[in-house]
């Protein structure tokens, strides 16, 4: 106990003096500190949430572990694959230094290259090569767009197998006269108005068809005479049959 000074009372007195000297500064600094801490926590929280959303979206589109047995799983394309897609090489097509595309093909018969022309796009030059390859090699040709040839062949197949249109049947000539010797239903009449003159028409009635034809005036006259003779015979037969019973 001897030779030692208690420090408890002195320290408490120093603290009270500091608080009395800087009361406003201490309160303001505490308030500012609280505001800064809350602002920093909000900023850090927003950044963490955004980074978490970005990571989750990337994980959804491109899973970290690739499963070759999952057909629905997508794989992020590499820079090399993207370059290959942009620089797709077509058969018989090469690019000129000024940017256009040239197409050429080798003739198997002449063993020489055939110039097909210069085109604005690589696809146009590739199509020109496909057309020339089909002419030279037929179905054995290796094409840049074989799917287009298949579509074209299917369209030609459908067009060739369409139902042919029926030609319109010719209208029969109704003025043509067909004479039927076995037909007993023949009606002859004269439109001339006079005996043995004018134009007569003969009409034949059958179960299926009715024909009409122009006949000469002589046939009309002969049929008229035949009718008069039949009429006279009818009356003569009537007179002969009624005379024995008349009583006169």
Swiss-Prot record:
Q: Show the ranges annotated as biased composition (Polar residues).
A: 45-80, 239-248
Tissues expressed in: Strongly expressed in proliferating cells. Detected in root tips, stipules, shoot apex, floral tissues, young siliques and abscission zones.
Region of interest: Disordered: 1-21, 45-90, 201-248
Pfam families in the cross-refs = AP2 (PF00847)
Q: Which residues bind DNA?
A: 89-146
The subcellular localization recorded is: Nucleus
Q: Which domain of life is it from?
A: Eukaryota
A cellular component annotation (GO) from this entry? nucleus
Q: Which PANTHER family match?
A: DNA-BINDING DOMAIN, ETHYLENE-RESPONSIVE TRANSCRIPTION FACTOR ERF114
Its function, per the record, reads: Transcriptional regulator of cell proliferation and axillary bud outgrowth. Involved in maintaining the structure of the shoot apical meristem as well as plastochron and phyllotaxy. Activates several genes involved in cell cycle regulation and dormancy breaking, including CYCD3-3, DPA, and BARD1. Strongly down-regulates DRM1, DRMH1, MARD1 and several genes encoding different types of cell wall-remodeling proteins.
Tell me which family the UniProt entry assigns to this protein. Answer: Belongs to the AP2/ERF transcription factor family. ERF subfamily.
Under what name is this protein listed?
Ethylene-responsive transcription factor ERF114
């Amino acid at each position: 106990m001897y030779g030692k000074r208690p420090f408890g009372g002195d320290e408490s007195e120093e603290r009270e003096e500091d608080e009395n000297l800087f009361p406003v500064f201490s309160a303001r600094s505490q308030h500012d500190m609280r505001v800064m801490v809350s602002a920093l926590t909000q900023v850090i929280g927003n950044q963490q949430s955004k980074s978490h959303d970005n990571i989750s979206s990337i994980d959804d589109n491109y899973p970290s572990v690739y499963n070759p047995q999952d057909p629905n799983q997508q794989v992020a394309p590499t820079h090399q694959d993207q370059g290959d897609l942009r620089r797709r090489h077509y058969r018989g097509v090469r690019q000129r230094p000024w940017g256009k595309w040239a197409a050429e093909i080798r003739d198997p018969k002449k063993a020489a290259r055939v110039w097909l022309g210069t085109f604005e796009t690589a696809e146009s030059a590739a199509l020109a090569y496909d057309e020339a390859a089909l002419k030279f090699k037929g179905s054995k040709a290796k094409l840049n767009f074989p799917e287009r040839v298949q579509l074209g062949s299917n369209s030609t197949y459908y067009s060739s197998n369409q139902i042919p249109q029926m030609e319109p049947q010719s209208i029969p000539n109704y003025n043509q006269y067909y004479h039927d010797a076995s037909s007993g239903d023949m009606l002859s009449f004269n439109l001339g108005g006079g005996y043995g003159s004018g134009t007569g028409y003969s009409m034949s009635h059958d179960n299926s068809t009715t024909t009409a034809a122009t006949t000469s005036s002589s046939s009309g006259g002969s049929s008229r005479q035949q009718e008069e003779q039949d009429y006279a015979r009818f009356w003569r037969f009537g007179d002969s049959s009624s005379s024995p019973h008349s009583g006169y």
